[in-house]
Amino acid sequence: MARVTTGITSSHIPALGAAIQTGTSDNDYWGPVFKGYQPIRDWIKQPGNMPDVVILVYNDHASAFDMNIIPTFAIGCAETFKPADEGWGPRPVPDVKGHPDLAWHIAQSLILDEFDMTIMNQMDVDHGCTVPLSMIFGEPEEWPCKVIPFPVNVVTYPPPSGKRCFALGDSIRAAVESFPEDLNVHVWGTGGMSHQLQGPRAGLINKEFDLNFIDKLISDPEELSKMPHIQYLRESGSEGVELVMWLIMRGALPEKVRDLYTFYHIPASNTALGAMILQPEETAGTPLEPRKVMSGHSLAQA
């Protein structure tokens, strides 16, 4: 049967994609960010770590959806998803190849589990989906695995609650485990961490909130899932609510997990950046060395 072997989190800051495209990923500003991702890139190439399929949880930024249609949860069931034109032409990255059989199976299972999914048989994917792929897989001619895009509305109020997202992750795991094909499946939760793009608090970053969120995501995700929207807004900025998508990833893993790697960097553009590798405790691999990396212009200690 298929199984969820790994959960990965990653910010999806669009400037990361621009740094790759402009050849500035190794300069003084961006170099530490890409250095922090290198252990994940190396890890995923090791035998047994490369997924057959990634369920990639992200939010669309007015590319596939706009104010005319705002699905709370959607799932891409197509064969192929093209990079979206976000105003400067599509990112020069490979098309995303889907896994329709698994995607339809998950959609059916989730709907029968009382999650009202929007099924997308045609959809372009923006930086929310493609930047994490670039940060972890680099610049291949083709992405090395199939990807099921899983958009979540965190742009237009009301977004789903953390509790609902955590429960959705659990249902995703059950759906995957009932699929008969032998597949290594990852669930990636993207977005965040603390940031605010507009208004009087534009540029807000809250390191204390972010690091506490990381710790709770590992040790007590159920309690973390009870955090109300207003707390995300107050403490992590208007865009910090993207972190509910990390709870979908965490819900797809069992209660006890092992954190293989955690990277935190501030600032990346105007955002706090986080990336993690989590695996079920019973089947987890060896943690990376170092296990936790912190960097950035605003962090005195590495």
Swiss-Prot record:
GO biological process, one term: catabolic process
E.C. no: 1.13.11.8
InterPro entries xref list: PCA_45_Dioxygenase_B (IPR034937), Xdiol_dOase_suB (IPR004183)
SUPFAM superfamilies membership: LigB-like (SSF53213)
Broad enzyme group: oxidoreductase
GO MF terms, alphabetically ordered: ferrous iron binding; protocatechuate 4,5-dioxygenase activity
Keywords: Aromatic hydrocarbons catabolism, Dioxygenase, Iron, Oxidoreductase
Cofactor(s) the protein requires to work: Fe(2+)
The reaction(s) this protein catalyses: 3,4-dihydroxybenzoate + O2 = 4-carboxy-2-hydroxy-cis,cis-muconate 6-semialdehyde + H(+)
Chain's role: Responsible for the aromatic ring fission of protocatechuate.
Subunit record text: Composed of two subunits (alpha and beta) in a 1:1 ratio.
Protein known as: Protocatechuate 4,5-dioxygenase beta chain
Gene encoding the protein: ligB
